[in-house]
């Protein structure tokens, strides 16, 4: 019980962000959902995540690694590999295979003073490349507000439309992020990802390294690291 109380206290303190990424999949977003934010033109991201049992359709702890690049601030593409635990020809069990998937995101409408930004995206679209556990098309809206001076509060809402019967992403999702003006490199977030609730935080170190950690329904903990830089200036 004390551990859960401390986690809850940490999560409530932690709802903040100008660092923008759907951390678990290597895309722009919150912890495990996309947002309609976009990175700056020419931004490259690469990294890896620990994904415990319960975060994926698999019944084992695993992880992924990814690369991501944003073109012209309206088009973003990423490619990721999720490690699969299998049995090798000699009977040894280990992470010998990978589930490969990609994401493409297009922003037809940038956020304005009175309207949200809009992004349309697709995850894992190619049916001939595997089981397509993350196969979805989605639309998402994000609107940010300035509160208490220059603090930033952002609200996100969206909907997943699965493109196959195996997809683990389906239905509505949404989240909130809060970024204090005194330290924009710190991020605290809470979200519903269509299957469960996630609460956590992220921070950027030395301008290029971002770390994140979050809990899924207070049952497991996920985290990761990523490197980001601008290839075009």
Which residues are covered by each model-predicted region?
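Short, solvent-exposed amphipathic alpha-helical segments in soluble enzyme
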Residues: 206-207, 228-230
């Amino acid at each position: 019980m004390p551990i859960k109380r401390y986690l809850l206290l940490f999560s409530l303190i932690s709802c903040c962000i100008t660092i923008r990424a759907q951390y678990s999949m290597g895309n722009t977003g919150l912890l495990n959902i996309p947002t309609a934010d976009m990175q700056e033109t020419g931004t490259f991201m690469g990294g890896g995540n620990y994904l415990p049992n319960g975060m994926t359709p698999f019944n084992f702890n695993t992880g992924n690694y990814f690369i991501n690049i944003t073109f012209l601030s309206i088009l973003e593409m990423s490619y990721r590999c999720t490690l699969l635990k299998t049995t090798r020809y000699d009977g040894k069990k280990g992470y010998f295979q990978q589930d490969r998937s990609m994401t493409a995101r297009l922003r037809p409408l940038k956020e304005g003073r009175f309207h949200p930004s809009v992004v349309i995206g697709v995850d894992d679209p190619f049916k001939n490349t595997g089981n397509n556990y993350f196969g979805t098309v989605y639309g998402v809206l994000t609107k940010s507000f300035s509160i208490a001076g220059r603090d930033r509060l952002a609200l996100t809402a969206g909907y997943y439309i699965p493109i196959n019967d195996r997809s683990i992403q389906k239905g509505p999702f949404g989240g909130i992020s809060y970024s204090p003006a005194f330290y924009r490199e710190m991020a605290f977030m809470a979200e519903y990802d269509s299957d469960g609730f996630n609460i956590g935080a992220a921070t950027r170190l030395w301008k290029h390294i971002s770390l994140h950690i979050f809990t899924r329904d207070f049952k497991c903990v996920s985290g990761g690291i990523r490197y980001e830089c601008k290839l075009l200036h």
